[in-house]
UniProtKB/Swiss-Prot annotation:
Keywords: Endonuclease, Hydrolase, Magnesium, Metal-binding, Nuclease, Plasmid, Restriction system
Quaternary context: Homodimer.
Pfam families, per database record: EcoRI (PF02963)
This protein's record includes keyword Repeat: no
Cofactor notes: Binds 2 magnesium ions per subunit.
Record organism: Escherichia coli
Catalytic activity as recorded in UniProt: Endonucleolytic cleavage of DNA to give specific double-stranded fragments with terminal 5'-phosphates
GO molecular function, one term: type II site-specific deoxyribonuclease activity
Gene: ecoRIR
Consequence when changing E144D: Only nicks double strand DNA
Sites where the protein binds Mg(2+) 2: D91
Protein name: Type II restriction enzyme EcoRI
Length: 277
């Protein structure tokens, strides 16, 4: 479904206090920040906003940790490991908070992926394809690698009631609206969001069970079916819609929103620290 309003509403949904935005400061304004750097700024903002709590940032989680978390739920889980030092490394890293019992709990996991250079190629007048006579390049499947990290974090957080995994998408393979790009020779090329050649969003919506994109889905959803109650861990998937690059300030606001949602879910396990003088 084409939804230009989804892109426009991003700047309206995430209004933060001047104090939190101030964390961004001159440094952020002067740099094109990678998602990992934004995660570190979110961690700093959380520390300022909640001085009673301890936060940490790390760039990877070992597979042994994931298996240990699974074993705590059921001894039949987490028993297979072939490479002892294997780990996962989301490009935005992981932000955690220490709870009242001294355990580190995940409040944010972030990734940013770019796929599809059609907009840049058209603006530069480049033609693609085997014979160099096409405006559009058939989309690849590299983005599907994101499913691995999402699945691993879901395993790591299987005992939690929240899933703060956010995936930022940009590039011509993630359009949610039709756009027109002008070549240097003046010819206009139309990119249609529902083109099977271009769009790869449907390759990722399995990670959020087909729920809305550009939405904070951090709180796990419980659904009832017959005699079963099923917990859904949905990734929060954000796309610009028109293929452009993400503004790091908007990324910061979305990531801070998801982090504070995590803290609300974890509230009873943070109560002692939050109420201590």
């Amino acid at each position: 479904m084409s939804n230009k309003k989804q892109s426009n509403r991003l700047t309206e949904q995430h209004k933060l206090s001047q104090g939190v935005i101030g964390i961004f400061g001159d440094y952020a304004k002067a740099h094109d920040l990678a998602v990992g750097e934004v995660s570190k700024l979110v961690k700093k903002a959380l520390s300022n906003e909640y001085p009673q709590l301890s936060f940490r940032y790390r760039d990877s989680i070992k597979k042994t940790e994931i298996n240990e978390a699974l074993k705590k739920i059921d001894p039949d889980l987490g028993g297979t490991l072939f490479v002892s030092n294997s780990s996962i490394k989301p490009d935005g890293g992981i932000v955690e908070v220490k709870d009242d019992y001294g355990e580190w709990r995940v409040v944010l996991v972030a990734e940013a992926k770019h796929q599809g250079k059609d907009i840049i190629n058209i603006r530069n007048g480049l033609l693609v394809g085997k014979r160099g006579d096409q405006d559009l390049m058939a989309a690849g499947n590299a983005i599907e690698r994101s499913h691995k990290n999402i699945s691993e974090i879901a395993n790591f957080m299987l005992s939690e009631s929240h899933f703060p995994y956010v995936l930022f998408l940009e590039g011509s393979n993630f359009l949610t609206e039709n756009i027109s790009i002008t070549r240097p020779d003046g010819r206009v090329v139309n990119l249609e969001y529902n083109s099977g050649i271009l769009n790869r969003l449907d390759r990722l919506t399995a990670a959020n069970y087909g729920m809305p994109i550009n939405s904070n889905l951090c709180i796990n959803k419980f659904v009832n079916h017959k005699d079963k109650s099923i917990m859904l861990q949905a990734a929060s998937i954000y796309t610009q819609g028109d293929g452009r690059e993400w503004d790091s300030k908007i990324m910061f606001e979305i990531m801070f929103d998801i982090s504070t949602t995590s803290l609300r879910v974890l509230g009873r396990d943070l109560f002692e620290q939050l109420t201590s003088k």
